[in-house]
From Swiss-Prot:
Gene name linked to the record: iccG
Entry's Gene Ontology molecular function annotations: FMN binding; oxidoreductase activity
Organism of derivation: Talaromyces variabilis
Entry binding sites for FMN: A24, A25, M26, T27, Q107, A338, R339
Enzyme class, UniProt record, top EC level: oxidoreductase
Alphabetically ordered keywords of this record: Flavoprotein, FMN, NADP, Oxidoreductase
Name of the protein: NADH-dependent flavin oxidoreductase iccG
Signal sequence coordinates: none
Pfam family of the protein (one): Oxidored_FMN
Top-level taxonomy: Eukaryota, Fungi, Dikarya, Ascomycota, Pezizomycotina
Annotated metabolic or biological route of this protein: Mycotoxin biosynthesis
Ligand binding (substrate): H180, A181, A182, H183
């Protein structure tokens, strides 16, 4: 069994990873009361994934500012805690992630207007749209409200916080970071003309909207070793029209030239959560419907524009054959696996790369949780996504109980 999926890949920073099947980031809520990692449940879970045979293990979302959380239990970097204490907790986390030589990177993020139950900040004072009608409006007003437009000083502060978090990850022993610029979080809000109405240096054109991301990449690069990996997660579903696609390609060229090591393609926001639900049958191209992955068509459309930049697609892969086909067709260089990695944490080692498992049985299982009746009645997709996310969080937090089942 000679799989392209099993071949090593060398990133721009010089790191060589043993295969092209990577465990993608998910919401995990492993933070303690000080927003630190390091609980036994957290470390045990990552020891399991580290022994699973993944080419790379990505951690769950880490927020760069504890005042704005993407999820209530997220790990975050609190500058009021002595750095030695924070670094000790992160080193224990990195060690757990790196068992048996595994490589791990930290996903770093700021939720922007998707921070709940606080006066959130965003590039512009544009609120979330959870759907038509009074009930979605009431829910949005209660949970998210209308964000406050950031000052330039606040933008500079966020850039600094991303760089400081990356430096912390490097000092702790992680192999790199992934900048989260997808799923409707702060950086995706800046990149999108729909949520960024600024007319200063950080808005008004595709290039200006990408400036905060470019500044973050440069700030990180100036503060970490050259061999430290810096990847980025990018939305596909924000770029449906010809103008949006043109802007997208301009931004991706700028991001690639700034010095990232890989680009992960995902999609969706709290308004339209395709990262959980996939692309709707009505909107999906026929070619997308016949493939497993949600975002392969977008990946193929940008492939020729980004020569030399490793491309990762996450979302929808469920079989060895589907994963291998994506690589053979040159749709991507890397396959990202999220929820199946919870139900089958040893998926690469025990199933996908196991010669004794035939293709028909080489399946990445995922559990689909029914949308609550109230969510269907209200017509708010985000509620259904939330129910499924909570189900998987509980599974993740109990994953360490199988640590000895090697």
């Amino acid at each position: 069994m000679d799989l392209n999926l099993a071949k090593p890949i060398t990133l721009r920073c010089g790191i060589t990873l043993p295969n092209r099947l990577w465990k993608a980031a998910m919401t995990e809520e492993f933070a303690d009361k000080r927003r630190l990692p390091g609980s036994e449940a957290c470390l045990a879970t990552y020891r399991v994934w580290a022994n699973g045979g993944w080419g790379l293990v990505m951690t769950g979302n880490v927020d760069v500012d504890p005042a704005y959380l993407g999820s209530p239990g997220n790990i975050a970097v609190d500058s009021s805690i002595p750095r030695e204490k924070t670094l000790a907790a992160w080193r224990a986390w990195a060690e757990a992630c790196s068992q048996n030589g595994a490589k791990a990177i930290v996903q770093i993020n700021h939720p922007g207007r998707q921070a709940s139950f606080t006066k959130s900040i965003a590039p512009s004072a544009v609120p979330l749209n959870l759907g038509p009608g009074i009930l979605p409006w009431m829910l949005r007003s209660l949970i998210y409200g209308t964000p406050r437009e950031m000052t330039v000083d606040e933008i500079h502060d966020v850039i600094m916080k991303f760089a400081e978090t990356a430096r912390l990850a490097a000092d702790a022993g992680f192999a790199g970071v992934e900048i989260h610029a997808a799923h409707g979080y702060l950086l995706a809000q800046f990149l999108s003309a729909a949520s960024n109405k600024r007319t200063d240096a950080y808005g008004g054109s595709a290039k200006a909207r990408a400036k905060i991301v470019i500044d973050i990449i440069h700030a990180i690069r100036s503060d970490v070793p050259k061999t430290f990996c810096v990847g980025i997660k990018f939305n596909s579903t924000d770029h449906q029209s010809e103008t949006e696609m043109k802007d997208c390609l301009e931004q991706l060229h700028l991001i690639s030239d700034a010095g990232v090591d890989f680009l992960e393609i995902s999609g969706g926001t709290f308004e339209n959560p395709t990262f959980n639900l996939g692309v709707s049958d009505q909107k999906a191209k026929v070619s997308t419907q016949t493939r497993e992955a949600f975002f392969v068509d977008f990946a193929k459309s940008i492939r020729s524009e980004l020569s030399g930049l490793p491309l990762m697609v996450t979302g929808g892969f469920r079989t060895r054959q589907g994963m291998e086909t994506a690589l053979v067709e040159d749709s991507c260089d890397v396959v990202g696996i999220a929820r199946p990695a919870v139900l089958s944490p040893y998926l690469p080692r025990n199933i996908i790369f196991n010669r004794d498992v035939v293709d028909a049985e080489a399946i990445a299982h995922a559990e689909k949780i029914d949308t609550p009746t109230i969510a269907k009645w209200m017509g708010i997709k985000a509620i259904g996504v939330g129910a499924e996310t909570i189900w998987y969080i509980k599974k993740i937090q109990n994953l360490g109980s199988i640590e000895t089942e090697l």
